Amino acid sequence: MFKISRKNYSDLYGITTGDSVRLGDTNLWVKVEKDLTTYGEESVFGGGKTLREGMGMNSTMKLDDKLGNAEVMDLVITNALIVDYTGIYKADIGIKNGKIAAIGKSGNPHLTDNVDMIVGISTEISAGEGKIYTAGGLDTHVHWLEPEIVPVALDGGITTVIAGGTGMNDGTKATTVSPGKFWVKSALQAADGLSINAGFLAKGQGMEDPIFEQIAAGACGLKIHEDWGATGNAIDLALTVADKTDVAVAIHTDTLNEAGFVEHTIAAMKGRTIHAYHTEGAGGGHAPDILETVKYAHILPASTNPTIPYTVNTIAEHLDMLMVCHHLNPKVPEDVAFADSRIRSQTIAAEDLLHDMGAISIMSSDTLAMGRIGEVATRTWQMAHKMKAQFGSLKGDSEFSDNNRVKRYISKYTINPAIAHGVDSYIGSLEVGKLADIVAWEPKFFGAKPYYVVKMGVIARCVAGDPNASIPTCEPVIMRDQFGTYGRLLTNTSVSFVSKIGLENGIKEEYKLEKELLPVKNCRSVNKKSMKWNSATPNLEVDPQTFDAAVDFNDLENWLEQSASELAKKLKKTSSGKYILDAEPLTEAPLAQRYFLF
């Protein structure tokens, strides 16, 4: 039997079971859990390689032919290292008709056993050796202010947005709301010309009939925002309509505690599922204790990325952002006090730890209204690095294997936001049957700059060189638009998410939309337990005087490799015996100045 060293094998075919690779310049490593390709039968494209006629490529089968369960693919990504909530493993990925059709072994079934997907004359190849593949990310907190957010999102690995807004109007600068049929229609019509999946949230304040009218117009969910009034009555009515129409509800709660405190908001929910934006509170919400919502099973807590991770610059940055985003006047003392009440270093420090415990389930941006859409993935991995550096390995992880922590963090901007908004049957993970929205990364650039972004099987953005060069790798090598963003391909490789009732009402024809419309579903049946790798509900309390966030000893167990007793010795205790979640701000971040000039 022929033998080959692991080094030579990885150079030829990419790493395999038991090998590890570092993610960017972070301290995180992933270890390959399994390899679904076949040693000695690897699919490789190129001169002298295996995917040629009569070898790994079958030249007799037509596009619709099958052999067993295997069929001819439109595109095969060979020897991909998949990083997903489902696992960290190596496989070929087969794409057909815009969807992931197979994950496993590609090749020619006339010559090779156990082929899951066929490379035929109709098949294109993308060489995945040495690259990491993740599902396209979701950003569920997007202010629909300007179309240029789309290429920025794609360049950060985000292929889907749950947004709200009307363009550069003041209401949209503050709130993610497309109010009423005209603006829902306008948002969907604009999205029809943009290379990204999108769904839009309507205004959640009002009586049942006008709220229902917006969902019937195609809104995929509702947004309750304090700038429009986050009262108990608004919460109750929005959730009542949502339950009848199976759409999600997102909430930005009452910072000023005018209509009640956090416990009154919780009571108004009546145990019904709701997606809580920026749970820490710097982005808005009951001051100072909105963070306590992480302990409830019906609340799906999220963060926005300006506070992630907690660094030496975080506090100073926030005051000016707040004044602009919420139409506040720095000359009015009450407006300044409003802004000051939202910036608390204690709860910001605790936010990172709660993410690491799996108590905050979702990451998002709050783009152009404090957050940055192109940094959702980057800041998620910076936070994971910070937590490992300050607290050590997650339970079950080991040297050169941070797989559990990586699965926890990748879930925060892929599968969990998809579940929260009823689109997880279409997107959010690399699983057979889902849309082929896939992001490729060179390991050294992981989390910072993708190599390419595939939308429904077609490359939309890719690292590419000078268009007038003799080869595609000549400088300047930058992310550029590809054919997936042009012509009918644009509308054929993205979708819009709408309410089921809107779709049944014929809005596609009424609005003259070209993109496929997909209905959101199962929004009302999910809860915190539905969140992959992020379903913890610690008994958190925030001290109203000191703003310290503290949990019980039991909440520290089964989190880290170090024991809860060892960790407890390092944490300060409250007078009631709880343990304060605290960490030093980061002074130097990975995936930062080594990769970006600005």
Swiss-Prot record:
Gene3D superfamilies per the UniProt record, alphabetical: Metal-dependent hydrolases, Urease, subunit C, domain 1
Subcellular location field: Cytoplasm
GO MF assignments: nickel cation binding; urease activity
Pathway: Nitrogen metabolism; urea degradation; CO(2) and NH(3) from urea (urease route): step 1/1
Name of the top EC class for this enzyme: hydrolase
Pfam families in alphabetical order: Amidohydro_1, Urease_alpha
Binding site for Ni(2+) 2: K223, H252, H278
E.C. code: 3.5.1.5
Modified residues (N6-carboxylysine): K223
Binding site for substrate: H225
Predominant location category: cytoplasm
GO cellular component: cytoplasm
Cofactor: Ni cation
SUPFAM superfamilies registered for this protein in UniProt: Composite domain of metallo-dependent hydrolases, Metallo-dependent hydrolases
Cofactor note: Binds 2 nickel ions per subunit.
Binding of Ni(2+) 1, residues: H141, H143, K223, D366
One GO BP annotation of this record: urea catabolic process
Reactions this protein catalyses: urea + 2 H2O + H(+) = hydrogencarbonate + 2 NH4(+)
PTM comment: Carboxylation allows a single lysine to coordinate two nickel ions.
NCBIfam families to which the protein is assigned, alphabetical: PRK13207.1, urease_alph
Family of the protein in this entry: Belongs to the metallo-dependent hydrolases superfamily. Urease alpha subunit family.
Known partners and oligomeric status: Heterotrimer of UreA (gamma), UreB (beta) and UreC (alpha) subunits. Three heterotrimers associate to form the active enzyme.
Annotated protein name in UniProt: Urease subunit alpha
Phylogenetic lineage: Bacteria, Bacillati, Mycoplasmatota, Mycoplasmoidales, Mycoplasmoidaceae
